[in-house]
Amino acid sequence: MTLVYEKSSFVLIMAQIAEAQNIMTRSTSSNDLLSTSAGSPPSPTSAAILLSSSPSPTITIASLPSGLNIVSNPNGNPAINVVLLNVNLNKEEEKMTLGQLLACFPEVPSNIPIQLNPNQHKLRRDTIVSQPVITSKQSSLFETSKQSNIPLSASVTNLQTLNKEKENYNLLNSSTNSLHSLIITPPTSNNTSSNNFVGGNIINSSSEDSILPPPHIITTTTTTTTSLPPRSPMPLPSSNCINIPNNINIPDNISESSTCSLSSNASNNYPQSPPKYNNFEINQNNNNSISLSKSQSLDNILTNSNNNNNNEITISSNIPIPLPPQSSSPPPTRNNQSSPSPSSPQQQNIMPTPPSTSLTPPQSPTLSPSSSTHSTPTQTTTTIKLPPSSPPSTISQNNARKTQIPTTTTTTTTTTTTTSTTSTTSPNPVVNNKNLNTPSSSFSPTKRLTIAFGSLTRSSNTPPPESSIVPIRWEINLNQIKIASTSTSNTNTVSSQNLINSSNTNNNNNNNNNNNNNNNNNNNNNNNNNNNNNSGNNNNNNNNNNNNNNQLYEQYYKLCKGEFQQNTSLYNKTFNQLLDVDINTSLSLLDKCYDSILKSNGIGLLSSKDQYLSTQSKEKDPNRVKSLLSVVKNAVSEDILNVKPSKTMLYFSNFGKTIPINLEVIDECILNNFSSKKVKFKVLMGPPSKTHTINVSEKEGFIGKKSSITLNFSLILKSSIKLRRVVIIEIEGGVRYFILVQVESNKTAFGQPIEDSELVEDNTSFGPMLVPRALVILKQAFFGCNAHLTESIFRLPPANDSEYNIVKDRVNREAIGTTEPHCIATLIKVFFRELPNLLLNDIDPEIFLNFKPTAQSADTASSAATANSSSSGSGNGNSSPNNDDPTMDPVFIVNLIEEKRRSTFLWLVDLLAEVTKFESSNKMNSKSLSIIFSPNLYFAPSICSAENSFAISGKVVSFILELIQFNKSL
């Protein structure tokens, strides 16, 4: 297998592998580098890494039997431009990068992985944990060369020639849990090798008897950044630095998806175009100073060495931080980070061997491995290092001279986007001064300046949105609740012939009577058993009711005390329970809550003066005269002001009676202020209603101390309704009172269930139909005043509202006494609108959604849905006609309606069909009338989404339109 690495990672590979494998050798007798001819291939028993002058940004690594050379070939001959590497890959190690294996495995890995484990994303990519505490054995790296398959590269041969006194050196410091400082010190040998510099090319030749260390110390400063915009190029280094070419762009990270990425290519052992290095020059004097810096693009490589007191190679690049393997234990947190003691071998500054390569990541904030993060290229960081004020000296046993070794650290600054709720610490760079103040070193702290620029990405760990708030209800119609609770499914259906002729009604009634007789006998037999079980069930029900009342009391208590903020889900749910729960239960619990809140404040039902006198009478110690001032202060400055209303329910002087429609009734409520300060109050009436009008004399104001104020409430019922609603009286610094209103209007033709209405027979095109008597009266008045010939009938409102209210109250009791066509037409619409349960509401919404209208009615659906103001969202009512399915026939849907309601609905369809016959006069066609009446016949339930509600409204229009057309064809 051929592994291709991008050029940006080659610096890291050279720093971590090349030293360990003795790629770079130095002669003990000469400072010159030997070279071979540029075109000569390496020997069969050696391995070579060839730096070609080809502009390709990748380098290919393959296998050779043994040995290792560095060969730079300006001609770019692909035949010799390889380093052969025997690779044995398994599934686990294929998921890790080369840098991860080198950084995380205490032993030499058996293969080189080519990709990152997807599970590694569960760990933070910007996390650097404690310093390594695991030290591998001395020969772990070199013993693998004895195997037949050499895993990483051609290892150092003839290891028996190594000096035994060097075997105690730590060659690899690693930890499976964390990033670490990798110190690789190659052994020395007395054998010599020659290095030559020829024509800008370097050929380092080594034999089995010649193993020499490199002539320098590499100190790597790696700044890993993620940035959206390309980095500005760094300034060119001085003559003491290695200049890297500018014509090759190096990506910041190694990723499988990038163009110059870490990939595997089994079919091609050579790069398409090897990397190009124009110049490579080394000048070595007494003290070596090599500096390698990488800008955004590479152009040249220049290596110089001057006679200064620094011996250093600085590599600045963007290299991805290796992550620990997934199988390892999770990285420790910041609290349990440990750093090696100064006496550890990793921290010794006295190097018996020649200079070594050191990679030292710093301490960094950590995150729990359970959090899922991913890196986001959002920030670019530039690290500027200043030289130490007093550099130390290190004794080298190889040349017996002092070499200055400055201490550097690896600063990593990344910006991540976290998708979990785990909090992160600040990712500021941390300077690791582990070599400071050691027995063999007198380093001063390294001065560092970090400049960060770029836009930071917002964290994605935003809290999830709150659940939708339950809408508040200020009023309910108890008649509708009664109908909703007693409504049953419809089981009787008729065919299209029965739709026209309902002569089978009597037969059905006879069958039902027989069934009822049988059911009565069964019920009599079961009465005794049920009575025996009722006693035990009643006890259980009582316990459940008590528990429910206790929970309801706690909610009411918090509601009255103001612990629930308005327009919140808890506030609205508790507020709605005031309307849903039995009124006697709500009143008793509210009174209990008011008393508990006032008593908890030491107020109770007494005034401040009465409380003071009661407290003084209970005092048995006559010497407690000094407590008078504190008692007065407590009485004056209560936590909750003692203000109470005279009543908590408004009957409008008609308890147990009905209220006439369109007649104003008045009731009053007195607010008593028992506190010793002026109190502000506010009355909340809620939004206006279509069924009634309620007003108060003063919506807000002040109540003087020890005084009271009277609030007058007026109510006008506009339709037949059994009303229950809530009025709120808020006391600033006191209790929030909820005043219940429950009244019932006189029974009229409007607002009554069809089942409870007086039904009479009326002739239609479908045959005789039983409909409410009020509709028959309105129909006669409608055609009597030629309303069917009036333009825009059923569309325009009545001309006089007062006349409209009068006529509405007269319907079904006496002659309506009006000839205004729009008033009569509006009353017909209002009759269907004010039904407790609309005519078509018993039909399942799925039936309307699946209804497929004909082509003509389908064209009407989209425009009808747009005109229907009761729906919102977007939908398309258009559908291809399909009359093959009998369940989609309009007659089938009509049969789903209960019998009395079905007769009323068909009566309306017949009336609308009759009006459309005079379209030339009234300008109202079937489409217009269907759009007008659809919201008065069906309202989509709240469980339907906005899109479905919008679609259903269009289907209802098409359904009504097809029935009108069907009636006109009869």
Curated annotation (Swiss-Prot):
Annotated ranges, domain Rho-GAP: 754-970
Site annotation Arginine finger: residues: 795
One Pfam family hit: RhoGAP
Chain spans, region Disordered: 30-49, 258-285, 312-446, 487-550, 860-886
PROSITE patterns hit by this protein: RHOGAP
Signal peptide: 1-20
Biased composition (Polar residues): 392-406, 427-446
Chief location bin: cytoplasm
Annotated CDD domains: RhoGAP
Biased composition (Low complexity): 35-49, 258-269, 334-383, 407-426, 860-885
Keyword Ribonucleoprotein: no
GO molecular function: GTPase activator activity
Name of the protein described by the UniProt record: Rho GTPase-activating protein gacK
Species of the source: Dictyostelium discoideum
